[in-house]
Amino acid sequence: MTASPDYLVVLFGITAGATGAKLGSDEKELILLFWKVVDLANKKVGQLHEVLVRPDQLELTEDCKEETKIDVESLSSASQLDQALRQFNQSVSNELNIGVGTSFCLCTDGQLHVRQILHPEASKKNVLLPECFYSFFDLRKEFKKCCPGSPDIDKLDVATMTEYLNFEKSSSVSRYGASQVEDMGNIILAMISEPYNHRFSDPERVNYKFESGTCSKMELIDDNTVVRARGLPWQSSDQDIARFFKGLNIAKGGAALCLNAQGRRNGEALVRFVSEEHRDLALQRHKHHMGTRYIEVYKATGEDFLKIAGGTSNEVAQFLSKENQVIVRMRGLPFTATAEEVVAFFGQHCPITGGKEGILFVTYPDGRPTGDAFVLFACEEYAQNALRKHKDLLGKRYIELFRSTAAEVQQVLNRFSSAPLIPLPTPPIIPVLPQQFVPPTNVRDCIRLRGLPYAATIEDILDFLGEFATDIRTHGVHMVLNHQGRPSGDAFIQMKSADRAFMAAQKCHKKNMKDRYVEVFQCSAEEMNFVLMGGTLNRNGLSPPPCKLPCLSPPSYTFPAPAAVIPTEAAIYQPSVILNPRALQPSTAYYPAGTQLFMNYTAYYPSPPGSPNSLGYFPTAANLSGVPPQPGTVVRMQGLAYNTGVKEILNFFQGYQYATEDGLIHTNDQARTLPKEWVCI
């Protein structure tokens, strides 16, 4: 409980758009502000004041023109928001003759005028609101306390309260907004008089700033307090999210940025509010703008929030125990980097809080560094100085720097410490002829995208294809990973027809996605299989992979029938020659081939449910046998000199029966730098 203020200042705002329950939901700007002072001690009301506010966009809806009788010409000469607020502050100060011990508080009809209009607009325009706008009385809630028998709060408005008290509607003022302020003044006088004797003692509060913090996985979170924000700029921080929801109270540590499988932000965040009321107001900001981007806002659950922000790591809790710190994430550190080197990297202009204690290195479960770290700074100035070092060198590597959040720290540590991003294969044997997805066909109804940004998502690809996105077969978008489990910059897409695939390749080739141009090639499922096995595909045609080159041996030798499985020792042979990649199982996990597989692509990124996903990359058993198509045996030579030629290799095998020079396959091992040769003998 707090002491009752001496005065209430009744405040009513009008925007250039919707009124009533939809006020502020259309992101329209404030154009008119009314206020009136109510003396609670002497039970008197002051004069009605108003000020026109010039919006940046001089456009009024028809409903607004009809309600307010305001035209664009009158607004063009009005005061801007900061000037109007100074005029309001000066007027209230003069009327109340504010001195030592004099107090006043705003009073509004509901939450929208302060939370959905003034705070969001002032934040966007970088206008500093006076302190009085951070607390206010909601007349509807106060009326419900005063008159418990009145209608529910969501059904209350000025007209309903006036009717409940048997007041006649104010006839002295007929203008919209002015009449509401007149009636609100009369309602307040009735509430503080007999028989109600109501005291205004517990105002609503607006948070000054967002507080970061940790969240335990054991914490119970109300499902009705969480939203999912989608479409965020990738560089946005929790402070940017708090600014987008300015006026609404976010719980401590309640802004959690979501990361994708590669540990990068995916443009989504989960936000937890202090109450269901604030969550509902947040949903009204659906498709409001953050800069030039509109943000989608949807309901989410407490479980969703805990999956992202929850954690129990003592190391993280200790690191985040220092409050009011700005967190910066470092990415691309040398694996041998030490805390002393990180401290020296930032230097004296941006000292790290606590020195080495303010650095948290991210490691895998076995203790190996990931190249990521989080650093604490005591203030915004130090953090900004630190971010200016983005892409500066530490050793021989450039370091990427981003603003971060407590939830992101927890999420990254959970991701790397619990299990590898790419689980390692454990079976002691490798299937030779696993099941295949779809038989390869010569119909060129597929397209290949090459040069995608590494952070590209399924949604980015659909936006990139534009009108052709509707021609994608159900579950036909596949993003390919490299042998490290990271995006390769390639994707394969199965279209509904060869004609549409041709048109997509023609119109989208070298079209930009973000800051990169993307190459688009038409191909068939069979050509796709060739590419995934090591071949190349471009606009000049197809070059077959090594395993499809001729492999000749004396016809007199018959090769034994292959077994269903082979021991792991067979990994010394090129897998594209002797075995198929393991078939993908229906799951959302990543499926790498083992480190012994030397393929162009050893795994792919499965499309999420509802996205296009049934095209197989791997050839069927009919087109890829478990052994070379001709009788013979393949051996691998490792450690050759870089200038070794075919003649030297054949001389080396002198005395053995080997194939012709056509049976010599040149290869490069992706995991090593040593040259190798494959010889059919």
Curated annotation (Swiss-Prot):
Upregulating conditions: Down-regulated during the epithelial-to-mesenchymal transition (EMT).
GO molecular function, one term: mRNA binding
Keywords: Deafness, Disease variant, Methylation, mRNA processing, mRNA splicing, Non-syndromic deafness, Nucleus, Phosphoprotein, Repeat, RNA-binding
Cysteine disulfide partners in this protein: none
GO cellular component, one term: nuclear body
SMART domains: RRM
Record PTM Omega-N-methylarginine, positions in chain: 582
Subcellular location: Nucleus
Modified-residue entries (Phosphoserine), positions: 543
Listed transmembrane segments: none
Cross-referenced InterPro entries: ESRP, ESRP1_RRM1, Nucleotide-bd_a/b_plait_sf, RBD_domain_sf, RNaseH-like_sf, RNaseH_sf, RRM_dom
Domain of life: Eukaryota
Gene Ontology BP annotations: mRNA processing; regulation of inner ear auditory receptor cell fate specification; regulation of RNA splicing; RNA splicing
Tissue specificity annotation: Epithelial cell-specific.
Residue ranges of every copy of the RRM domain listed in the record: 225-302, 326-406, 445-525
Family: Belongs to the ESRP family.
Purpose: mRNA splicing factor that regulates the formation of epithelial cell-specific isoforms. Specifically regulates the expression of FGFR2-IIIb, an epithelial cell-specific isoform of FGFR2. Also regulates the splicing of CD44, CTNND1, ENAH, 3 transcripts that undergo changes in splicing during the epithelial-to-mesenchymal transition (EMT). Acts by directly binding specific sequences in mRNAs. Binds the GU-rich sequence motifs in the ISE/ISS-3, a cis-element regulatory region present in the mRNA of FGFR2.
Disease: Deafness, autosomal recessive, 109: A form of non-syndromic, sensorineural deafness characterized by bilateral, congenital, severe to profound hearing loss. Sensorineural deafness results from damage to the neural receptors of the inner ear, the nerve pathways to the brain, or the area of the brain that receives sound information. DFNB109 affected individuals additionally exhibit vestibular dysplasia, although they do not manifest problems with balance or movement.
Protein name: Epithelial splicing regulatory protein 1
Organism: Homo sapiens (Human)
